[in-house]
From Swiss-Prot:
Keyword presence, rRNA processing: yes
Gene3D superfamilies: Vaccinia Virus protein VP39
A molecular function (GO) term: rRNA (guanine-N7-)-methyltransferase activity
Protein name: Ribosomal RNA small subunit methyltransferase G
Binding site for S-adenosyl-L-methionine: 84, 89, 136-137, 155
One Pfam assignment: GidB
Length: 247
């Protein structure tokens, strides 16, 4: 069997590469999520990556590889939030893989959040998954969310300075922000460092990973607040993207 065939299905090769193995129930939920995405894509443009390695590598594996420490303590209670959830990655996959966690999914597109709610219900995750249909700038200023999360994350949302402005205000004092990135350069690092000075946060980890089956290179960035985030951040809707911090 070729490597491509191995990684097109949720077999042992995939989980060995990840260094974590789901329970039979978790695997069934991930397969069910794939089927739900196929159904919902007929009505809502959630994601085109729903078949074979596109799903298992570019969605599931890519959502989980930065979370090795969390996966080793999967039953630990933790509050997580996924900004720009789209089709449910990484948020729904994390809800499956981390049974001790409560997950808040945020997306500004109402049709997508309706799909997320329905999929979470079908997967039996309603008790641990909350869905908010709003812009990230509003989430970060809402007292129900600001400063309350152990882990705030975003995948394929915007540039690192913009994403940092969305995530850092959501962190509790011991919390971490996780930025999923593809390409990462010294210039990207400089831009992020400038933004973090405004947000009173530091970069505490940067890790590079090659995806299986030559599916590309990914980076994870971990941020931690050094002081309470200034109340002015995140700025009003649209401002972070139009005028990134430090630009």
């Amino acid at each position: 069997m070729s490597n491509q065939a191995c990684f097109s299905n949720p077999g042992p090769e995939l989980w060995n590469a990840l260094g974590w193995h789901p329970s039979s129930e978790q695997l069934e939920q991930m397969i069910a999520l794939q089927a739900l995405l196929r159904q919902w894509n007929a009505r809502v443009n959630l994601t085109r990556l729903v078949e074979g390695g596109d799903y298992w590598i570019l969605q599931v594996f890519d959502s989980l590889w930065p979370l090795q420490s969390e996966l080793q303590n999967a039953q630990q209670p933790r509050r997580c939030i996924d900004i720009g959830s789209g089709g449910g990655f990484p948020g729904l996959v994390l809800a499956i893989a981390l049974p001790g966690a409560s997950i808040t999914l945020v997306d500004s597109v109402g049709r997508k959040t309706a799909a997320l709610k329905a999929m979470a219900a079908k997967l039996g995750l309603t008790s641990r998954v909350t869905v908010r249909s709003e812009r990230a700038e509003l989430t970060g200023q809402d007292h129900c969310c600001r400063g309350l999360f152990d882990l705030a994350m975003a995948r394929a949302v915007s540039t690192a300075p913009v994403v940092a402005e969305y995530l850092v205000p959501l962190l509790k004092p011991s919390g971490e922000a996780l930025l999923f990135r593809g390409h990462w350069s010294p210039n990207d690092a400089k831009d992020l460092a400038k933004a973090l000075r405004f947000l009173q946060a530091d970069l505490i980890k940067m890790e590079r990973r090659e995806l299986p089956d030559n599916r590309g290179v990914r980076h994870q960035l971990r941020l931690r607040a050094t002081l309470p985030c200034p109340a002015t951040f995140p700025r009003p809707i649209g401002v972070p993207a139009k005028n990134p911090l430090g630009s």
